[in-house]
């Protein structure tokens, strides 16, 4: 039976080589597939790929621009901060100088007031001393005259004599105390 089937088909077909009709159909199908891919699919893929490349490159450029702008703003902020710090230091130094000037003015005024109070106190002390000395002279004179009257036994009622005697006596005491 095997022989019959083999003898019935006079063409022998090699299992390694395909039939030429299959090669033609395969080539036509491959050409049609290549045409469809080249005409429709590959351009669409190229557009999508180019859009992604543009988006990535644009994103990188935007990121670089944003980074450059951020660096520029950072430098501006640093410059402003440095300027603000120097202004604050200047203001602080000016305030210290003003405070020292005010302090010196207050001290000078306090010294003047202290000197004025001391001078007024000295004047008051001198005036009170003079008043006390005058009162004591009068009282000492009266006591001395009374004592002298009792010792001498006569009345020293004459006011002018009494005042002259008392003044001479007190002047003698002062000159003796001054030595």
UniProtKB/Swiss-Prot annotation:
A Pfam family reported for this protein in Swiss-Prot or TrEMBL: ATP-synt_B
Gene label: atpF
Complex formation: F-type ATPases have 2 components, F(1) - the catalytic core - and F(0) - the membrane proton channel. F(1) has five subunits: alpha(3), beta(3), gamma(1), delta(1), epsilon(1). F(0) has three main subunits: a(1), b(2) and c(10-14). The alpha and beta chains form an alternating ring which encloses part of the gamma chain. F(1) is attached to F(0) by a central stalk formed by the gamma and epsilon chains, while a peripheral stalk is formed by the delta and b chains.
Keyword Ion transport: yes
Protein name: ATP synthase subunit b
CDD domains: ATP-synt_Fo_b
NCBIfam families named among the record's database cross-references: ATP_synt_b (TIGR01144), PRK05759.1-3 (NF004412)
InterPro entries: ATP_synth_B-like_membr_sf, ATP_synth_b/b'su_bac/chlpt, ATP_synth_F0_bsu_bac, ATP_synthase_B_chain
SUPFAM superfamilies per record: F1F0 ATP synthase subunit B, membrane domain
Function: F(1)F(0) ATP synthase produces ATP from ADP in the presence of a proton or sodium gradient. F-type ATPases consist of two structural domains, F(1) containing the extramembraneous catalytic core and F(0) containing the membrane proton channel, linked together by a central stalk and a peripheral stalk. During catalysis, ATP synthesis in the catalytic domain of F(1) is coupled via a rotary mechanism of the central stalk subunits to proton translocation.
Domain of life: Bacteria
Key words, A-Z: ATP synthesis, Cell membrane, CF(0), Hydrogen ion transport, Ion transport, Membrane, Transmembrane, Transmembrane helix, Transport
Family: Belongs to the ATPase B chain family.
One GO location term (cellular component): proton-transporting ATP synthase complex
Transmembrane segments: 23-43
Listed GO MF terms: proton-transporting ATP synthase activity, rotational mechanism; proton-transporting ATPase activity, rotational mechanism
Protein location: Cell membrane
PANTHER family, per database record: ATP SYNTHASE SUBUNIT B, ATP SYNTHASE SUBUNIT B', CHLOROPLASTIC
Main localization category: membrane
